[in-house]
């Protein structure tokens, strides 16, 4: 029987870690990682002493902010991540953290995960933007994932492993979250006129925009594919993190989100078409049915 889900980091003790992982852990020292690093989750590094165990692991628990927990629970974010590691992680075509423990109460959304500590890998500063060679590797990786489930991902939403990007829960929640963030940003930052023309009207446009993201052929979408959730290992091996927004929808969403969020504006203008063409070629070379890859519609 799996170890009980801890109510807080204070319950992540040596005994709990031993029960959860099967290791012989004699001491645990927990430290929160950063401030504002985990928005939907509280993220900790647990330093371990014992035998047959790594020196450190990452522990994820619900966020410390009750509002963030509420939003995450409504969107089934904790449920999605636990289900991903239990059912899909072994099949994705890139490296992910090894999961040592993952449980969620689907009624309360209380959850806990213990995963591999990948803190030694190379990170990318999303503010500066990802170098184009790294971006190409990231596009190749997401294309391979999309190809594997191209035209076949509706079943994942049907069984609750993912949520469709067109699910009614998104337009019920996202405009509220956006409005809160928009108010804070406009109070603190002077927005360009071009942004001010769009921002006040964006919330009302969310529903039709999201609906369009599920008008197939659908695939497995990461949902938050950007530099902050990507690492690079030895020989520039692609490593992808964070699967709380895993969804079913059109793969072009992941690509557009990545290009607009993870490379500089200059590189986006210069390489946008190249990256799109690379993604299309990746889909086809990895087995996505040619008759289901409409390049014109996806662009």
List each language-model region with its residue ranges.
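ATP-dependent phospho-/nucleotidyl transfer catalytic cores
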Residues: 2, 121-222, 234
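Glycine- and acidic
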Residues: 67-71, 123-128, 241, 258-265
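A generic secondary-structure signal for well-formed alpha-helical elements
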Residues: 92, 122, 146-153, 279, ...
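Conserved NTP-binding catalytic cores of kinases and kinase-like/nucleotidyltransferase enzymes
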Residues: 1-110, 233-238
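Active-site acidic catalytic loop and adjacent metal/ATP-binding pocket
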Residues: 37-48, 52-53, 57-58, 205-251
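Helix-rich C-terminal or lid/interface subdomains of diverse kinases
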Residues: 136, 281-299
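Active-site activation/catalytic loop segments of kinase-like enzymes and analogous catalytic loops
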Residues: 83, 87, 245, 251-288
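Conserved short submotifs of the Hanks-type protein kinase catalytic core
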Residues: 108-121
């Amino acid at each position: 029987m799996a170890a009980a889900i801890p109510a807080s980091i204070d319950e992540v003790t040596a005994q709990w870690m031993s029960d959860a992982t099967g290791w012989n852990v004699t001491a645990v020292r927990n430290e929160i990682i950063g401030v504002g690093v985990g928005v939907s989750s509280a993220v900790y590094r647990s330093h371990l002493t014992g035998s047959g165990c790594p020196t450190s692991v990452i522990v994820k628990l619900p966020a410390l902010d009750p509002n963030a927990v509420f939003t995450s629970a409504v969107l089934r974010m904790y449920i999605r991540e636990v289900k991903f590691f239990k059912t899909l992680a072994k099949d994705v075509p890139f490296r992910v953290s090894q999961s040592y423990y993952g449980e969620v109460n689907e009624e309360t959304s209380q959850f806990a995960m213990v995963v591999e500590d990948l803190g030694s890998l190379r990170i990318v500063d999303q503010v500066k933007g990802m170098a184009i060679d790294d971006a190409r590797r990231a596009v190749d990786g997401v294309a391979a994932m999309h190809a594997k489930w191209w035209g076949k991902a509706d079943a994942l939403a049907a069984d609750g492993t993912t949520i469709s990007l067109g699910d009614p829960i998104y337009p019920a929640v996202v405009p509220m979250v956006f409005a809160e963030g928009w108010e804070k940003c406009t109070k603190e930052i002077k927005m360009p006129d071009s942004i001010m023309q769009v921002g006040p009207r964006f919330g009302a446009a969310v529903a039709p925009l999201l609906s369009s993201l599920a008008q197939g052929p659908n695939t497995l979408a990461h949902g938050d594919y950007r530099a902050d959730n990507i690492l690079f290992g030895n020989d520039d091996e692609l490593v992808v993190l964070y699967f709380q927004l895993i969804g079913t929808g059109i793969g072009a969403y992941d690509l557009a989100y990545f290009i607009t969020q993870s490379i500089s504006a200059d590189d986006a203008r210069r390489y946008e078409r190249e990256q799109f063409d690379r993604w299309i070629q990746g889909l086809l070379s990895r087995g996505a049915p040619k008759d289901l890859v409409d390049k014109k519609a996806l662009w």
